[in-house]
Amino acid sequence: MKRVVLLIVVAGVLLLCVVAVLRKGAPRPVTAQPPVMPAPPAAVTNAPAVSNAPPISYVPPLAATPVEKLPKGWEDFRKLREIGQLNRVTAAMENRTLPADLLAFFEKEIFNRQHWDVTRNNMANALVWQESPNPRLHELFAKMLADETESPVWRDYCLQFLSECMKSSSDPEAIKSLLARYAQGKDGLAGTAIVNIGLQEGAGRIKPDETFSQQLEAQLTDPEVVIPTKLSILGMIGKRHDVRLLPLVRSYATHTNDSLRRTAMATLGLIGTRDDLPLLQPGLTNRNRAVQMAAKGAMARIEAR
């Protein structure tokens, strides 16, 4: 009986040991961790801006560049090279009834100094040669003529076109005044103005008084007047048959400048007398062929009268 009880006790002790071993190797339960709370946000304050920070200014959006509206059939004009633009304008120049939009374009584009002078010249021709030109076209040429930043060549062109406008102008008196004013100068423009006064006189649109002849005399004796203008004056004296100035013309028939000399000889051929033949004779053997021809032609005209 004692042996049985002892075995039961031993068995119980062994069972407890096994249970203890099993519990020691078993996984431990995961204990719940407290949640991690985010840090509270920093308080927002109305702190002033840093003093050296650049101010933020409003920049409006860029306005769209307006698209230039060119005349019908001329949409590619800006893309052409200058020679192409010249050819396009020259072709239009021959049309005496150009559409209004193209004429308006020429009246603005003629101020564009990026064009060759010949291109601008042909635009002017197109405007002036119309069957019914703008009666105020002279104002356009007067404006460019007065602009001293324009080239001398282009201002000379403008003076000629200004004169050309007289026959269709709404204000021919304004053109007469401008021609008269520029004719009194000492530069090349004066010569151009004088020639055009003569042309308009021949057309019956201008009738210069005696003071014009006196002006020509004063300019021809003025050493500061440029040679091209004196050439124009000598030619004008012959064209107007201004025999009052014949003695002055004779003085130029022996001038050392060949251009002045031959022009004076040509004028003597128009208004000179047989008394001028001895004056012209030396010109026949002059070294300059042009002077020889002028002397020969003048003598032939005088002898034919």
Language-model segments: residues:
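Juxtamembrane proline-rich low-complexity "stalk" or linker regions positioned immediately after a signal peptide
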Residues: 25-68
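Hydrophobic membrane-insertion alpha-helices, especially the h-region
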Residues: 7-20
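Sec-dependent N-terminal signal peptides of Gram-negative exported proteins
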Residues: 16-18, 124, 253
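Short inter-helical turns and helix N-cap capping residues of alpha-solenoid HEAT/ARM repeat scaffolds
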Residues: 81, 114-116, 149-151, 185-187, ...
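Amphipathic alpha-helical scaffolding segments comprising HEAT/armadillo-like alpha-solenoid repeats
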Residues: 60-75, 97-111, 132-146, 168-183, ...
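Structural detector for internal amphipathic alpha-helices that build alpha-solenoid repeat scaffolds
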Residues: 58-63, 78-97, 117-133, 153-169, ...
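Positively charged n-region of N-terminal signal peptides that target proteins for export
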Residues: 1-4
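Positively charged, low-complexity intrinsically disordered regions
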Residues: 24, 29, 34, 53, ...
